[in-house]
From Swiss-Prot:
InterPro entries according to UniProt: Kinesin-like_fam (IPR027640), Kinesin_motor_CS (IPR019821), Kinesin_motor_dom (IPR001752), Kinesin_motor_dom_sf (IPR036961), P-loop_NTPase (IPR027417)
Protein name stated in the entry: Kinesin-like protein KIFC1
Other facts: HeLa cells lacking KIFC1 show multipolar mitotic spindles and a defect in chromosome congression and chromosome alignment during mitosis.
GO molecular function, one term: microtubule binding
Stretches the record annotates as Disordered: 23-94, 109-136, 325-372
GO biological process per UniProt: cell division; microtubule-based movement; mitotic metaphase chromosome alignment; mitotic sister chromatid segregation; mitotic spindle assembly; spermatogenesis
Protein family membership: Belongs to the TRAFAC class myosin-kinesin ATPase superfamily. Kinesin family. NCD subfamily.
Coiled coil spans: 142-306
Function comment: Minus end-directed microtubule-dependent motor required for bipolar spindle formation. May contribute to movement of early endocytic vesicles. Regulates cilium formation and structure.
Residues that bear Phosphoserine: S6, S26, S31, S33
Pfam families: Kinesin (PF00225)
Length: 673
């Protein structure tokens, strides 16, 4: 029998589903080789698609006017299975749009031919009973059976063709309905989105309107409170207005009274102006007289200082310090002056005994007394304030334009540094001449500012150690740097001397001066000697350059004030062995004695009016050249020790001071322009 293609096979050749179709029972006998997929596997494959398709109806419920397609007709089941079993059950009205689109876009697949049944297999009987097996020789019976079977197969094929046609019609209707439902669903979803957007917009507008209403209600409440407050304030302002009106009336009455008084005052002012002009003229005349009196005071002050001598010598004896032996009675005597004990002492008597001298009887010779007379002698009980009171007028001469030089001379440990700088601890009673002199200058300059004078002060502080000039105001990195300090003239043809690489610090108050003195005290060279635990081994020179100006009269003056603390010296026993430290002290002593000898030679040369004064023989005298000349005022403090062991050195110092006191260097000249 020629095998014919079944309509179901044609459908399978044109449509290939991704999921197995609904199993349909068939009455065709099974072929020799059964299909590989079992019915239960086909049902399992359909389950996900069924759930997805049915889920569409559960998720989105769409109401449509299209009629539903009737369900597929159930195909009666037969003993065998054919390719019609692969037709899907999801061809009803619930098929999704995805299945319909997949069916439409599938490419046709070649039809699978129906396998021929084996010759050994005999299909079952229609009644379910097995036909009896014919003998092999009954070919006619076998042919009849085959013809009957063929007839039944043709009838079943015809029935299946009809069923297949019905299924195809139902499938087309379902696909059309799915497509229409998909279109309608898309339209409804778009409409739903618009409606939802409009609803959300309406909700937002409603929310905004409610917030606006709340805000307006709050503003209304605030405005009502403000209106009440303004009404209250209006009442207060009306009360205040009535009060101000009454005050205005009172002010108008007082204004009329004031205008009358003003007229009287204007007449009085005119009279006062005339009187002021007269007073101004009188004040100008008084200022002229005051200026003349000030110049006369300066002249008389200078004349008084000249009468006292341009070189004056004061002697000061320091007190005995704790731990030192008490000097014998009569070692130092201070005879009274011509006016009796009330006059300040000006004489000093020193007693010296020489054990090498004796009488013919072998008894020691009586002590020898040495009498000295100076401009002023300060006993051990004299305080720092008493000492400064004697030199205050001399210091003030520096403001008048006269160069002034004050220096302390004496042996090591005689109190020179104490006299010039003061004692440690910052006790005001122990302040030396330098801080007291500057305080006095600042005070007098402040008083003279009322007469039109303005002063400026520039300080410098150097030491001369072994004929080397060092800056005592060097700080930080400036110490030991910048080269050696040298004494130079300020400019070509200038008589003013300056120290290179040294600091010149403007000062205007006591605190600045105290800071400079503290710094210099730390930098000064000191060493232990036989006479003093800390002995100054250098000459310290504090110089204050004073510049004054009277701008309205065009007057200028300027002069240096030099305050010098000379180095102390002591004699070394030549019989002692000199170690490294003693050799260094010996070189220092030689340099100190050399500079002090040069200072004495300079003073003697000035006193003798010699043509050549050896200023350059020593750095000390060269630096003080402008303060030692004929135009300067000079004061020498000779400091001596009260101890008996220092009598020899004290006697040498007093003899040197006595020679200086006998010198006269001429009349001082003020530096004025």
């Amino acid at each position: 029998m020629d095998p014919q293609r079944s309509p179901l096979l044609e459908v399978k050749g044109n449509i290939e589903l991704k999921r197995p179709l609904i199993k349909a029972p068939s009455q065709l006998p099974l072929s020799g080789s059964r299909l590989k997929r079992r019915p239960d596997q086909m049902e399992d494959g359909l389950e996900p698609e069924k759930k997805r398709t049915r889920g569409l109806g559960a998720t989105t419920k769409i109401t449509t006017s299209h009629p539903r397609v009737p369900s597929l007709t159930t195909v009666p089941q037969t003993q065998g299975q054919t390719t019609a079993q692969k037709v899907s059950k999801k061809t009803g009205p619930r098929c999704s749009t995805a299945i319909a689109t997949g069916l439409k876009n599938q490419k046709p697949v070649p039809a699978v031919p129906v396998q021929k049944s084996g010759t050994s297999g005999v299909p079952p009987m229609a009644g379910g009973k097995k036909p009896s097996k014919r003998p092999a020789w009954d070919l006619k019976g076998q042919l009849c059976d085959l013809n009957a079977e063929l007839k039944r197969c043709r009838e079943r094929t015809q029935t299946l063709d009809q069923e297949n046609q019905q299924l195809q019609d139902q499938l087309r209707d379902a696909q059309q309905q799915v497509k229409a439902l998909g279109t309608e669903r898309t339209t409804l979803e778009g409409h739903l989105a618009k409606v939802q957007a409009q609803a959300e917009q309406g909700q937002q507008e409603l929310k905004n309107l409610r917030a606006c209403v709340l805000e307006l209600e709050e503003r209304l409440s605030t405005q009502e409170g403000l209106v009440q407050e303004l009404q209250k304030k209006q009442v207060e302002l009306q009360e205040e207005r009535r009060g101000l009106m009454s005050q205005l009336e009172e002010k108008e009455r007082r204004l009329q009274t004031s205008e009358a008084a003003l007229s009287s005052s204007q007449a009085e002012v005119a009279s006062l102006r005339q009187e002021t002009v007269a007073q101004a003229a009188l004040l100008t005349e008084r200022e002229e007289r005051l200026h003349g009196l000030e110049m006369e005071r300066r002249r008389l002050h200078n004349q008084l200082q000249e009468l006292k001598g341009n070189i004056r010598v004061f002697c000061r004896v320091r007190p005995v310090l704790p731990g030192e032996p008490t000097p014998p009675p009569g070692l130092l005597l201070f005879p009274s002056g011509p006016g009796g004990p009330s006059d300040p002492p000006t004489r000093l008597s020193l007693s010296r005994s020489d054990e090498r001298r004796g009488t013919l009887s072998g008894a020691p010779a009586p002590p020898t007394r040495h009498d000295f007379s100076f401009d002023r002698v300060f006993p051990p009980g004299s305080g720092q304030d008493e000492v400064f009171e004697e030199i205050a007028m001399l210091v003030q001469s520096a403001l008048d334009g006269y160069p002034v030089c004050i220096f302390a001379y004496g042996q090591t440990g005689s109190g020179k540094t104490f006299t010039m700088e003061g004692g440690p601890g910052g006790d005001p009673q122990l302040e030396g001449l330098i801080p007291r002199a500057l305080r006095h200058l600042f005070s007098v300059a402040q008083e003279l500012s009322g007469q039109g004078w303005t002063y400026s002060f520039v300080a410098s502080y150097v030491e001369i150690y072994n004929e080397t000039v060092r800056d005592l105001l060097a700080t930080g990195t400036r110490k030991g740097q910048g080269g050696e300090c040298e004494i130079r003239r300020a400019g070509p043809g200038s008589e003013e001397l300056t120290v290179t690489n040294a600091r010149y610090v403007p000062v205007s108050c006591e605190k600045e001066v105290d800071a400079l003195l503290h710094l210099a005290r730390q930098n000064r060279a000191v060493a232990r000697t036989a006479q003093n635990e800390r002995s100054s081994r250098s000459h310290s020179v504090f110089q204050l350059q004073i510049s004054g100006e009277h701008s309205s009269r065009g007057l200028q003056c300027g002069a240096p004030l030099s305050l010098v603390d000379l180095a102390g010296s002591e004699r070394l026993d030549p019989g002692l062995a000199l170690g490294p430290g003693e050799r260094e002290r010996l070189r220092e002593t030689q340099a100190i004695n050399s500079s002090l000898s040069t200072l004495g030679l300079v003073i003697m040369a000035l006193s003798n009016k010699e043509s050549h004064v050896p200023y350059r023989n020593s750095k000390l005298t060269y630096l003080l050249q402008n303060s030692l000349g004929g135009s300067a005022k000079m004061l020498m403090f000779v400091n001596i020790s009260p101890l008996e062991e220092n009598v020899s050195e004290s006697l040498n110092s007093l003899r040197f001071a006595s020679k200086v006191n006998q010198c006269v260097i001429g009349t001082a000249q003020a530096n004025r322009k």
